[in-house]
Amino acid sequence: MDCQKLFSVIDTLSEEYFAILEDVCNLESPTADKAGVDKVGAYFVEMARKRGWKVESLPLETAGDPICITLNPEANARPVTFSGHIDTVHPVGLFGYPPARREGDKLYGPGALDCKGGVVASFLAMDALERCGFTARPVQLIIQTDEETGSKTSGKKTVDYMCSMAKDAVAFLNTEGSDGNKITVARKGILRYQFHIRGKATHSSRCEKGVNAIVEAAHKILKLEELKDPEGLTCNCGVIRGGTVANTVAEECSFLADIRFANQEQCEQAQALVQELAEHSYLPGCTCRLEKVSDRPAMPLEDRNLALLETINGIYAQVGLDALIGKKERGGSDTAYTTRAGIPCLDGFGVDGDGIHSVREYALLSSLVTSAKRQAAVAWGI
């Protein structure tokens, strides 16, 4: 099969897929809105079934149903797997109506960059592969539904499903937002803890008789905020609630700590520090209850992932695509789980844009074409 013909088909189909991305961005799908997430999933399922592709899904009660769409399911070779998530972070209505809008090469809307654009690019790549007669191996598209909560919404059922469906993949390409020709080979993991602190209330005029839970929280926060190593542990305490009125010593205070780590050793170090902080009181009479809110493993630098990058760059050299440069990211993603499962994977094959997790989020439509070509070339050449 001629890869240049494949690229030409992608170019020809591009306007159709720009409209598809606008459609799915107009379907708002915050993670907790199962009906909204499933509506986006149903959009892709309908497209796949019209083409005669195999469709599988995992019915869930609390999260959107994750989906696996397969082109050439009967082919006798290891699959190439594309993956991306369709859940977003903002409440319905925050973007106004309609949520999506086009301005030149920019498409604004919830999830345009993170990560609906990447999923649409994967579908475009598969569509073009089929139109060009590609039958050499299965090509999967796994659609994730609760990535934005670290898969807490489903109790990790979605990532277990993803790893199970992709277990035989020769390459797993995750379609989080792109950064030019840089591709993600390692990511930090995430630990989130809620600290619930209880002191002793009293009238503020007799504050020496009370124990201020907010002050205890402040001591703990300052200790956690010492973690600021870009290559190691970092912590952000971004949410705090405490007290009732100005003339009462605060009896209760809670705060949320978001800790990032690069490897398992750092993860264990962070867990030990958090436990020690919870057990130690800076103010006599204060107690602390620790709640683990969510977690996601790190995607450490692995030889098999670097080897996959080298293989892909060899393919790109043959077909005239720019080489990719590996980079480390501090944010988490689902490739942490596929890496832990031993599946060769890389991240950042989605679209370019800016404003992630804000009402200014946009995708560059021209980058959707680039993303589709990069993904299709891997399936064609690996």
Briefly describe each language-model feature range.
Residues 83-84, 142-144, 172-176, 196-198, ...:
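Short beta-strand segments
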Residues 79-81, 107, 170-174, 192-194, ...:
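Short glycine-aspartate micro-motif
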Residues 109-113, 144-150, 202-211:
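Flexible, glycine/proline-enriched loop segments at strand-loop-helix junctions
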Residues 66, 97, 138, 172, ...:
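Broad gene-expression machinery/nucleic-acid interaction feature
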Residues 116-188:
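Acidic/histidine-rich catalytic neighborhood of metal-dependent amide-processing enzymes
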Residues 90, 106-120, 203:
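Glycine/serine-rich anion-binding loops at beta->alpha junctions
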Residues 2-110, 131-134, 314-316, 335:
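Acidic/His- and Gly-rich active-site-bordering loop/insert found
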Residues 1-5, 12, 29, 56-59, ...:
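Metal-dependent amide/peptide-bond hydrolase catalytic core
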